């Protein structure tokens, strides 16, 4: 049995390696929609490609090699195209000849898009690997799988969004006249959507899927450093048969292209995933322009509480997957771990042993599970936060800086012990591969301390018999019990406090 499984695993690994090489070769060719093709086509408007103001170009680089892989041009408020992008989207929204207004057609088109993404799964994974730096296997097996599940789930909702009907409403003051009362669910309109750089393709689908299922049109701006999968999927939008103007994608920087999206008075809704600092800018812009509806998924400083009755091996395994997944560049990463004092030393020892086994290297290699930081600015800022923890008395068990053995933006997997709540590293979002471990004495103390933060995106509880009580007490949008990052697209996701407002995914995300 074990030999058969080993042979199967080797065949699967060999097959995935061939897929990787083929996809990478295609991405670097001149074919549509290869990276070279996107260099001259940086905006997708009204189902047509536009090359924007050529003087406004910016590079897209591979963070694992620090080399530029292409460049794209920027859309700004002063660029002139055939029609204003938002006006194109608004016109499509109200055009009865557009197939997207038919609820059954919406679901059909979304399912076709899912089929096309599955067909090009290897190419999209390779592009995500190149401009995001994440291991190819992770992009192919995890990100693309999640993309397909979310898109097909959302497609199923398209013809099930309807209002309610009430008959025979009697109003005595009007001589017992009987009235018909009903509600309608109508599309919001034009949705301006801005996605982040850490998981760009999945966030793209989180944004456009529900918007299109509900009958809206979209103007989407990807992060300027990771725009390639968003632009690539735009070609599939057209191939799937979506009418012109339903989905529009523009590249560019936040203060220019992003600001244009935020301030446009014909945009009816804003959906933003990113930092809390920028989220507040989004709120102000929405209020200043036309009081747009806003959904914000912002930063986090998620806690993980390990109680004495927890399965310690499982807790440590999940702690490392959750924090080191995507090199810590995940808003729900549980970088703030607090452990009951009676098991503190054992957890620290196991964490250290696990962290030392992390494999850094070329994210295109199959045995690599740990890639580079995506942004140079994060690569520079994370060591400063690590150094502040050292200065404040936290104990570095392993890591603690850049990894000079690799070319690229690599930070060593880092574990801190003896962390107190007053330290910067216990309060600020790191967005890097850093675990902090502290101890607690009682249940009430643990709850009080982990809730003492401005964030409220996620929390994690590892216990056998305290799950309901603890999860109900924590002020977080999502609480995972004895697991981490388990995705379910039927369940809403979003944050409390400075971690955002509104919900994505599930039925709530469509509302």
UniProtKB/Swiss-Prot annotation:
GO terms for cellular component: mitochondrial matrix. Pathway: Alcohol metabolism; ethanol degradation; acetate from ethanol: step 2/2. Keywords: Mitochondrion, NAD, Oxidoreductase, Transit peptide. Its EC number is 1.2.1.3. Gene3D superfamilies: Aldehyde Dehydrogenase, Chain A, domain 1, Aldehyde Dehydrogenase, Chain A, domain 2. The record marks 198 as: Transition state stabilizer. Its main location: mitochondrion. GO terms for molecular function: aldehyde dehydrogenase (NAD+) activity. It is found in: Mitochondrion matrix. Residues 72-92 are annotated as: Disordered. It catalyses: an aldehyde + NAD(+) + H2O = a carboxylate + NADH + 2 H(+). The active site is at 297 (proton acceptor), 331 (nucleophile). NAD(+) binds at residues 274-279. Residues 1-21 form a transit peptide. GO terms for biological process: aldehyde metabolic process; ethanol catabolic process. Belongs to the aldehyde dehydrogenase family. PANTHER family: ALDEHYDE DEHYDROGENASE-RELATED. This is Aldehyde dehydrogenase 2, mitochondrial. The gene is ALD2.
